[in-house]
């Protein structure tokens, strides 16, 4: 991120190109850290078969327009049945499994480094905001959008993109 900022300040790169580069770097971080976190989590709790984590990016990341000071607006979802149970040595129900996994993913993305947090992560755009669960099923998300979401929440969806999850689910969402 520092190198992109230097290029911008020195006028060696177009601001829109730097913004896209910040976004691409953040997406790689989301994908790599999420995959590593899932692998570690599955070692303890197994998998919930037929279910996967999906991460939506909203705001500047969703629109591929990050700046050096942007946070990551993320909504975490899971596919499959919420009542399913993981198959690990310490099994968890589907909803609990994905909420704990989501907490770890957010923690990995916001880990403290020598220069501060890797990324500031904002999850308040999830269904029901801070009053809602950190990670909800895709079906619950769709129902919330149809029945309860405010107009501004629908507007926020115009910049939303799937940045982590299976390609078929990304297309469906």
Predicted features along the sequence, with ranges:
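A nucleotide- and high-energy phosphate-metabolite-utilizing enzyme signature
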Residues: 1-173
